[in-house]
């Protein structure tokens, strides 16, 4: 089966987070020669398929070369394709049923076509057509919870794989990374995310008696330019400057003649490797040192980067250039993704997939040409990694 046929089938399953809807049974049926691991909690399901091609022992026997470098305990390169089969709710006003894929004017329409059943369909097809001549371990990791909290999805499966000594060396997450043409962007990392809540304390009172009040909004005004929109570092070649963004501000009882007793500010900082939760706390405490306050910070994801000169990045770039005739931009833009869980285990990981102009939108679609090219890129990566 090719990428188009597989993607059509995947879209037909209404897998709104965290529903799996039986899609894993279909995927398993495509890979009868692969071993299977499954896990999940709280309604989330995860699937891991893997196969060792030409085990070192078998390969040595075939080549009549039983030297010490071809012993059975020599581990082959383990490469993993990763993704999610869950989708966000489709919403209304689609031109067609979002879970009944249709082809129109060179595009495949359906929820998840770009994010990310198109990418999954492409790497499943590439995996089916892969036939290496040397020892190679190929795996596929899929979850039904990436669009949701992600607590029991890829992160949980990787923990299980660590217990079984099955963590991959390299992985491509098939997120829709491209902006205008297929191949124009590879994510080699992601920014981290820190959420915070700041409460400035005052003394509530009657507006007619200002000497008896301490209005925390006045205090906030004096430090707001040092908090809202401030750059926490200067970034680097791949990361934009880390920035603190206020997301909510609340004070008062709603009465026109009562000053508030406190003002609450919630904020988020998307940050590079140069900024940490500790450095952000140090900065804010310095700014707020003369003001009564409480401060809470929580890191929801850590920043990471895979070097632009890594083997995986180089092989992917070469295949994109060869197949798509495009030189990809290496960047770390966008929100968080499951790639961060791979990086946390020391796995070399990048993200590459379809154009993202209609992700989470009505009439989501992917071009038939994209699916064809994606499949070729992914297969080329497999073939090159197995030969190098």
Swiss-Prot record:
Pathway: Amino-acid biosynthesis; L-lysine biosynthesis via DAP pathway; LL-2,6-diaminopimelate from (S)-tetrahydrodipicolinate (succinylase route): step 3/3. Zn(2+) 2 binds at residues 115, 147, 360. It comes from the Bacteria. The keyword Zinc applies. Its cofactor is Zn(2+); Co(2+). It catalyses: N-succinyl-(2S,6S)-2,6-diaminopimelate + H2O = (2S,6S)-2,6-diaminopimelate + succinate. One of its GO terms (molecular function) is succinyl-diaminopimelate desuccinylase activity. InterPro entries: ArgE/DapE_CS (IPR001261), Bact_exopeptidase_dim_dom (IPR036264), DapE_proteobac (IPR005941), Peptidase_M20 (IPR002933), Peptidase_M20_dimer (IPR011650), Peptidase_M20A (IPR050072). The active site is at 86, 146 (proton acceptor). The keyword DNA repair does not apply. It holds the Pfam family M20_dimer. Binds 2 Zn(2+) or Co(2+) ions per subunit. One of its GO terms (biological process) is L-arginine biosynthetic process. Zn(2+) 1 binds at residues 84, 115, 175. Its EC number is 3.5.1.18. Disulfide bonds: none annotated. Keywords: Amino-acid biosynthesis, Cobalt, Diaminopimelate biosynthesis, Hydrolase, Lysine biosynthesis, Metal-binding, Zinc. Catalyzes the hydrolysis of N-succinyl-L,L-diaminopimelic acid (SDAP), forming succinate and LL-2,6-diaminopimelate (DAP), an intermediate involved in the bacterial biosynthesis of lysine and meso-diaminopimelic acid, an essential component of bacterial cell walls. NCBIfam families: dapE_proteo (TIGR01246), PRK13009.1 (NF009557). Homodimer. Belongs to the peptidase M20A family. DapE subfamily. This is Succinyl-diaminopimelate desuccinylase. It comes from Helicobacter pylori (strain G27).
């Amino acid at each position: 089966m090719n990428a188009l046929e597989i993607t059509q089938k995947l879209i037909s399953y209404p897998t709104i987070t965290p529903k799996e809807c039986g899609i894993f049974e279909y995927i398993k049926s495509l890979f009868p020669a692969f071993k299977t691991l499954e896990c999940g909690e709280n309604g989330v399901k995860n699937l891991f398929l893997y196969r060792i091609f030409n085990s070192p022992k078998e390969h040595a026997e075939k080549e009549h070369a039983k030297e010490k470098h071809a012993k059975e305990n020599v581990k082959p390169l383990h490469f993993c394709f990763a993704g999610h089969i869950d989708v966000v709710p489709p919403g209304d006003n689609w031109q067609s049923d979002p879970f009944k894929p249709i082809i129109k004017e060179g595009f495949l329409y359906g929820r998840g076509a770009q994010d990310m059943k198109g990418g999954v369909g492409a790497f499943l097809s590439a995996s089916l057509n892969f036939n290496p001549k040397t020892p190679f371990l190929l795996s596929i990791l899929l979850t039904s919870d990436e669009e949701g909290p992600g607590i029991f999805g890829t992160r949980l499966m990787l923990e299980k794989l660590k217990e079984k000594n099955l963590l991959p060396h390299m992985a491509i997450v098939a997120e829709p990374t491209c902006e205008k043409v297929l191949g124009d962007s590879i994510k080699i990392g992601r920014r981290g995310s820190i959420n915070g809540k700041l409460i400035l304390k005052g003394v509530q009172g009657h507006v007619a008696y200002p000497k008896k009040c301490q209005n925390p909004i006045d205090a906030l005004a004096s430090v707001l330019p040092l908090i809202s929109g401030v750059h926490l570092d200067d970034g680097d070649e791949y990361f934009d400057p880390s920035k603190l963004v206020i997301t909510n501000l609340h004070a008062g009882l709603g009465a026109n003649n009562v000053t508030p007793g406190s003002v609450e500010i919630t904020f988020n900082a998307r940050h590079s490797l140069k900024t940490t939760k500790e450095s952000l706390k140090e900065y804010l405490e310095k700014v707020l040192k003369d003001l009564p306050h409480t401060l809470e910070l929580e890191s929801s994801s850590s920043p990471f980067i895979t070097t632009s000169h890594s083997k995986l990045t180089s092989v992917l770039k070469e295949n994109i250039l060869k197949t798509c005739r495009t030189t990809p931009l290496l960047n770390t833009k966008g929100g968080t993704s499951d790639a961060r869980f791979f990086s946390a285990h020391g796995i070399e990981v990048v993200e590459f997939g379809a154009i993202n102009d209609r992700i989470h939108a009505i009439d989501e679609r992917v071009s038939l040409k994209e699916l064809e090219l994606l499949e070729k890129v992914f297969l080329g990566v497999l073939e090159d990694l197995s030969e190098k």
